[in-house]
Amino acid sequence: MCVDCKKRVRTRVAPSPTGDPHVGTAYIALFNIAFAHVNDGDFILRIEDTDRNRYTEGSEQMIFDALKWLDLDYSEGPDVGGDYGPYRQSERFDLYGKYAKELVEKGGAYYCFCDHERLENLRERQKAMGLPPGYDGHCRSLSKEEIEEKLKAGVPYVIRLKMPYEGETVIHDRLRGDVVFENSKIDDQVLLKADGYPTYHLANIVDDHLMGITHVIRAEEWIPSTPKHIQLYKAFGWEAPEFIHMPLLRNDDRSKISKRKNPVSLIWYKEEGYLKEGLVNFLGLMGYSYGDGQEIFTLQEFKDNFNIDKVTLGGPVFDLVKLGWVNNQHMKMKDLGELTRLTIPFFVNEGYLTNENVSEKEFETLKKVVGIEREGAKTLQELAKNSKFFFVDEFSLPELREDMDKKERKSVERLLNSLKDEIGLKSIKLFIEKLEKWNGNEFTAEQAKDLLHSLLDDLQEGPGKIFMPIRAVLTGESKGADLYNILYVIGKERALKRIKNIVKKYNIGI
């Protein structure tokens, strides 16, 4: 809760449309949404598209779609409107030049006419002297007359922030306490570029102020920029929002999450078949303790019980194994019919269905498959891949290959040998007989289990010797779903067809 809030709480997320929407955008959006929700406030989406060199066509729509997919809803934004728009920075272009020049008049910024050659020479000298790069304030002391003369002559310029040379700037960060910066170590940041476009620093502060943002919840990588932002607020005479810098998502080696080591595109997670509930739940565990060791929760539960002060700063590891576990929990919790509908496109991609339009009877069969396979699958894609046994009636037995590792070779040898073993052949023959005597085509799961277990009683052998050859002729594999579940789904006729095809194809002597 925000016990000191005097105004209506307003938070925002402000991604740039420069490619696929980033998982970090969803992470920061989630915490902004939860903070606004628990304080009866507003969460808005702003598109920061002033960097035209990196702008990617279609990226903005992908941001909208990704946030909506995850149910990370915003009450104001470019596609929904609002009282503080426009919400694209490119549509607010004239504002930034106006405020930059206003800041010059107030003495908080100045015109800089240094050309590219001078700035390059400055950087080279600083590098040779072992000094950190930064502007040297060359144009800071130009007289009013000199400035007017250059402006009249059309000399290209930028507008720079006039940072104090002395003293300190203190960030009052909600999670970290006071973070102190020496002003002398912060250079005069460009606010307005020569082409008239604002830098992030100017546009960000102007927009946050005009949109009434009360709390800036963003990644900790922005901490070094925050003293410049605080000085901008002071120079304008505006009240700064409260700053809350979230820990960065990390790879296993503690480096900042990047696409070289972890998928970062939200589109990838959707296409891989992660549920929105699973991904949002996982992001809610990043640097945050929900309480009482609870790790599985809904978005609504997260928002209702949110407390920003529970955020920890250790640098949460974005672990795909943990994400898979969380996602599996939500797959098991989800309504079976709804989960089946979500999985149908993945069955189509695997070639098990010709299209997504399935009959009522087909849907009921798919529900059986999904109900079985969701127990062990981490994603919808994995569920579909693991469901091969339920769909493919024509298959071949595996062959020994030179490139097999020891474990795989042993598994295949065991399967093939089971089809030569006397007990294995008896098992197949007796299984066929029992299927042919079965009244009707369908089984319940219990009936299928009882039929298979009756083989153990009749042959007085262990399950390994009996079920391995049956699995081989029923699926062509040495492992997979429980045999009784396969029988339960495919029924008597398909089971007999599979077995007889393999027996004939490989001349198995039963």
Swiss-Prot record:
Task: List where the motif 'HIGH' region lies.
Answer: 15-25
Query: Which GO CC terms are listed, alphabetically?
Result: cytosol
Q: Which ranges belong to the motif 'KMSKS' region?
A: 256-260
Highest rank taxon of the organism: Bacteria
Record: residues binding ATP: K259
- Write down the CDD domains for this protein, in alphabetical order: GluRS_core (cd00808)
Catalyses which reaction(s): tRNA(Glu) + L-glutamate + ATP = L-glutamyl-tRNA(Glu) + AMP + diphosphate
Task: State the UniProt keywords alphabetically.
Answer: Aminoacyl-tRNA synthetase, ATP-binding, Cytoplasm, Ligase, Nucleotide-binding, Protein biosynthesis
Question: What is the uppermost EC class here?
Answer: ligase
Localized where? Cytoplasm
Instruction: Give me any GO biological process, just one.
Output: glutamyl-tRNA aminoacylation
Known EC number(s)?
6.1.1.17
Which molecular-function annotation in GO is an example for this chain? ATP binding
Subcellular location, principal? cytoplasm
User: What's this chain's function?
Assistant: Catalyzes the attachment of glutamate to tRNA(Glu) in a two-step reaction: glutamate is first activated by ATP to form Glu-AMP and then transferred to the acceptor end of tRNA(Glu).
The family this protein is said to belong to: Belongs to the class-I aminoacyl-tRNA synthetase family. Glutamate--tRNA ligase type 1 subfamily.
Q: How does it assemble?
A: Monomer.
What this protein is called in its record is Glutamate--tRNA ligase
The organism is Fusobacterium nucleatum subsp. nucleatum (strain ATCC 25586 / DSM 15643 / BCRC 10681 / CIP 101130 / JCM 8532 / KCTC 2640 / LMG 13131 / VPI 4355)
Q: Which gene encodes it?
A: gltX
